Amino acid sequence: MKTTRLFFIPPLLWLIISTFLLTIPGTSFPKENWLDKIWLDKWIHIGMFMIMVFLWCGAIRKLNFDRTKLKKKFIFLAILWCAYGTGMEFVQKYFIPNRGFDIGDILADGIGCIVGLVYSTRRYIKKLTPVETGVATKTNCL
């Protein structure tokens, strides 16, 4: 069980880093420049939430759920982190100086969660062997 707990360290660290980045006061950001033209902020949100979902799915898969339950857990995680992103927009609006609510950030968070879900599903669920999924029989283990 101790080994399984170690798999939760990277996603917990990423959660702490992400929360810190999402709660930086708006005065700490540079003023408008060429980065606004390429929507760098949205790409950062996509990447941040893609990594969030991927890391949490990677940790959850170590808990040895069968394929169906694992897929449901992955979907739950994607929805959870999308809700977290939406909640952080409200935190930014009401509690962080010089930050505001941006529907574009919520959309970027959702896209990142979907990309993380698809990648995690393809990487972790599709590669499960019959023994790992708990449906091992004599015929498929030979």
Task: Map each language-model feature to its residues.
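Bulky hydrophobic segments
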Residues: 1-104, 110-132, 136-142
